[in-house]
Amino acid sequence: MEYQYPLDYDWSNEEMVTMVKFYEAIEKAYEKGIIREELMGLYRRFKEIVPSKAEEKKIDKEFQEVSGYSIYRAIQRAKEIEEQKLVKM
């Protein structure tokens, strides 16, 4: 990783750890693939931390600028496939 993840310093340490795990899961979806349930579980936790659609879009844009990976596209792909399948971008 040669870049910094978008983090909000108002988040608790636990929330920051969760967000980093979520960003890593998105990277994994693009680089190797990740089991759908693992990604969706982290996405549900992400939505607890970032419930606002506007904030979600802002974070996705910031993450895509630094990593080249789209949170939105990865989650859309995960929603399209069957359970226990690999999400691979």
Curated annotation (Swiss-Prot):
Transmembrane segments: none annotated. It comes from the Bacteria. This is UPF0223 protein BA_4171/GBAA_4171/BAS3873. HAMAP family: UPF0223 (MF_01041). It holds the Pfam family UPF0223. Belongs to the UPF0223 family. InterPro entries: BH2638-like_sf (IPR023324), UPF0223 (IPR007920).
